[in-house]
Amino acid sequence: MGMSFSHLLIVLLIIFVLFGAGKLPQVMSDLAKGLKAFKDGLKDDGSDNDKNK
């Protein structure tokens, strides 16, 4: 049971109401930076394990 389009739309509407139109671009930017840092951390973590073997 994945998220359907209607569920995604409802979640986005709730986020829009909570943060408002003015703050939403900043929230999305911070989220994107956090996801990029997380992916980079996973990539770095995996390469360290390969070097130790």
From Swiss-Prot:
It is a single-pass membrane protein. GO terms for biological process: protein transport by the Tat complex. It holds the Pfam family TatA_B_E. The chain crosses the membrane at residues 1-21. GO terms for molecular function: protein transmembrane transporter activity. It is found in: Cell inner membrane. Its main location: membrane. The Tat system comprises two distinct complexes: a TatABC complex, containing multiple copies of TatA, TatB and TatC subunits, and a separate TatA complex, containing only TatA subunits. Substrates initially bind to the TatABC complex, which probably triggers association of the separate TatA complex to form the active translocon. NCBIfam families: PRK01470.1, tatAE. Part of the twin-arginine translocation (Tat) system that transports large folded proteins containing a characteristic twin-arginine motif in their signal peptide across membranes. TatA could form the protein-conducting channel of the Tat system. This is Sec-independent protein translocase protein TatA. The gene is tatA.
